[in-house]
């Protein structure tokens, strides 16, 4: 059912906005569609069965498709940081006013249900020219937009950033706007940037803006780090592995993880990766192999260890098949049987178990 014959929106002015329009112009697969509604009130939406889900401003779920519909709105800066905004969603707000509040011109394009583009800010031209450009000076009112710019640069590797946009980001950082960012928002954008096709571009944007030292002051950022996270992206590593490589040269990786409130899985990988890389490079002895397996808790968490090896393989070659066989061989040992053999002399259990594991590795 198209929006032209959908009774839920019949008589409403609705437009697809933002990323779905941009990605369609780029020939990319369509993701979730966001809709903006012009000329309606919350009461109008409720009468049609739309489900309110918005917090700061009216957003509704379509009663059948569950797609998001937001009332057109304007916003005004009323405080510091990304939460310091007052929103207005009156029925008199126009589509052009709603588009004007958006971050980048490529994200400020709307499309009617019939497919007609509404582009008052020349976003289509910037899509074609592969340029990320801020919509207006209101960009400076929300420091999250610096992070989003970095994330979009990482996602769209062939896009450049307009010089005036980068200059504006620098002024924002110098004015202290980036200092108002909270960890949850930083992590949300950084993690999405790490999962993009060229994560190093995010670091480049944040560093050039002066924001990297503000939001991740512990991070050691250099060419090696950037090359490794890009190789991790090309290899399709999951987030934990990419984050571990990001932090590999950072002595204060635990402090960085706490600052960002990174997930436990990411912090564990960041802590263990330097151990794994050093151990893999140092020795091929069975004792060294067992030490690594035990220190990384590979017997209880083989999937995590496998992911760790894949991250280590970004740094130096790793025989993943051989290591998987080693872990499997050690896990196959019957620790209970060894304990029974040492009945009456518990002190013998630990060395006997280690000896059995070494023998298993020797035959793996």
Curated annotation (Swiss-Prot):
InterPro entries found in the cross-reference section: CCA_bact, NT_sf, PolA_pol_head_dom, PolyA_RNA-bd, tRNA_CCA-adding_enzyme
GO BP terms in the entry: RNA repair; tRNA 3'-terminal CCA addition
Cofactor: Mg(2+)
UniProt catalytic activity: a tRNA precursor + 2 CTP + ATP = a tRNA with a 3' CCA end + 3 diphosphate; a tRNA with a 3' CCA end + 2 CTP + ATP = a tRNA with a 3' CCACCA end + 3 diphosphate
Any coiled-coil regions, as ranges: none
List of residues binding CTP: 19, 22, 102, 148, 151
Top-level class of the enzyme under EC nomenclature: transferase
Residues reported in the UniProt entry to bind ATP: 19, 22, 102, 148, 151
GO molecular function: ATP binding; CCA tRNA nucleotidyltransferase activity; magnesium ion binding; tRNA binding
EC identifiers of the protein: 2.7.7.72
Hydrolase as UniProt keyword: no
Additional detail: A single active site specifically recognizes both ATP and CTP and is responsible for their addition.
The protein's role, per its UniProt record: Catalyzes the addition and repair of the essential 3'-terminal CCA sequence in tRNAs without using a nucleic acid template. Adds these three nucleotides in the order of C, C, and A to the tRNA nucleotide-73, using CTP and ATP as substrates and producing inorganic pyrophosphate. tRNA 3'-terminal CCA addition is required both for tRNA processing and repair. Also involved in tRNA surveillance by mediating tandem CCA addition to generate a CCACCA at the 3' terminus of unstable tRNAs. While stable tRNAs receive only 3'-terminal CCA, unstable tRNAs are marked with CCACCA and rapidly degraded.
Similarity-based family: Belongs to the tRNA nucleotidyltransferase/poly(A) polymerase family. Bacterial CCA-adding enzyme type 2 subfamily.
Protein name: CCA-adding enzyme
Source organism: Bordetella parapertussis (strain 12822 / ATCC BAA-587 / NCTC 13253)
Gene name per UniProt: cca
């Amino acid at each position: 059912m198209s929006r032209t014959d959908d009774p839920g929106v019949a008589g409403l002015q609705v437009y697809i906005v933002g990323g779905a329009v941009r990605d369609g112009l780029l020939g990319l697969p369509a993701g979730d569609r966001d809709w903006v509604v012009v000329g309606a009130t919350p009461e109008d939406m409720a009468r049609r069965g739309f489900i309110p889900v918005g917090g700061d401003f009216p957003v509704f779920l379509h009663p059948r498709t569950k797609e998001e519909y937001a009332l057109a709105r304007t916003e005004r800066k009323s405080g510091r940081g990304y939460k310091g905004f007052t929103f207005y969603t009156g029925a008199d707000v126009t589509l052009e006013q709603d588009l004007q509040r958006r971050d980048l011109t490529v994200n400020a394009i709307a499309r009617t249900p019939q497919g007609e583009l509404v582009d008052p800010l020349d976003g289509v031209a910037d899509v074609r020219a592969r340029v990320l450009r801020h919509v207006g000076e209101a960009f400076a009112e929300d420091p999250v937009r610096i992070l989003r710019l970095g994330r979009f640069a990482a996602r769209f590797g062939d896009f450049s950033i307009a010089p005036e946009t980068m200059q504006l980001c620098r002024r924002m950082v110098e004015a202290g706007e980036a200092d108002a960012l909270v960890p949850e928002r930083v992590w949300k954008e950084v993690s999405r940037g790490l999962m993009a096709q060229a994560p190093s571009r995010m670091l480049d944007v944040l560093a050039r803006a002066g924001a990297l030292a503000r939001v991740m002051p512990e991070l050691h950022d250099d060419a090696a780090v950037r090359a490794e996270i890009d190789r991790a992206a090309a290899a399709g590593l999951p987030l934990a592995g990419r984050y571990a490589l990001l932090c590999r040269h950072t002595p204060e990786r635990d402090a960085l993880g706490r600052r960002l409130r990174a997930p436990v899985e990411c912090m564990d990988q960041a802590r263990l990766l330097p151990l794994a890389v050093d151990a893999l490079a140092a020795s091929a002895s069975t004792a060294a192999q067992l030490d690594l397996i035990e220190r990384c808790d590979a017997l209880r968490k083989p999937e995590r260890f496998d992911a760790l090896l894949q991250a280590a393989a970004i740094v130096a070659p790793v025989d993943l098949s051989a290591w998987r066989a080693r872990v499997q061989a050690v896990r196959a040992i019957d620790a209970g049987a060894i304990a029974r053999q040492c009945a009456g002399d518990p002190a013998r259990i630990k060395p006997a178990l280690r000896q059995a594991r070494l023998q298993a590795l020797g035959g793996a």
